[in-house]
Amino acid sequence: WDEGEHMHLFVGDFGPEGLRPGTDIVGADAAWDVPLAPYFDMAEIAWNNAGTQLAYTCKPLTGTAYAVSTDSDIFVYDLADGKTHNICKPFDGKARYNAAAGHKPAMPGYDKYPVWSPDDRKIAFLSQRRAGNESDKSRLFLYDCRTHAMQDLTEDFDYNAMNVLWEGNDRLWFIAPIEATHQICRIAPDEGEVEVVTKGDHDIAAFTMAGEQIVAELS
């Protein structure tokens, strides 16, 4: 159901005098939520490291269309010019498909959880290929902010990806459910092959990295 209230994303300056009035970057008239309802997961929102751009997950639909569609996308808001673009649809400054005309959009499944590279040149995120299939494989995708090129890093890896972290600008780490366990994996985009780093009869729920050290939550 829809109660007529929606979660929006605001950006505002915080100075000595407190928080100044913020800008609703979703749009005051937008009748949808950021982060996505019903979980409102803050992991769907990510500042770049320079603090100049904000990536977020959004599904700009209303009513029944919002309820039945899995076509969420990653949007990037630029603080300098106030413009937003959708990185999951063909990028040429305007949409290349018309939903009203029955055209099928590119990447029609869930696209969520953006993670910026340390140099802010790339965004890693999770993507599902098929529309309407919430149990579809969760693929690890990489978007190049300069060329707008998109790369499926786990195309030949038959497991879901989750909890993505960057190691420098050239390697990504993540958790994958493998044969009733959860293991830590890594991949260098230029090498193109996933390496399963941990092994054993356990579930790794979360992990963090510092240099050559990894701390993991294991059960």
Regions found by a protein language model. Name each.
Residues N49-A50, P118-D119, E167-N169, M209-G211:
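Residue-level detector of Asp-centered blade-edge/turn motifs that repeat once per structural unit
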Residues F14-E17, D78-G82, D144-H148, A188-G192:
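Short loop/turn segments that connect beta-strands within beta-propeller blades
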Residues L54, D120-A124, L153, R171-F174, ...:
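Hydrophobic beta-strand positions that form the internal "hydrophobic ladder"
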Residues R20-T23, H85, Q151, E195:
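A structural motif specific to WD40 beta-propellers
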Residues E5-P21:
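Blade/loop signatures of beta-propeller domains
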Residues W1-F10, G27-M42, T57-F75, N86-K112, ...:
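A flexible loop/linker signature enriched in serine peptidases of the S9 family
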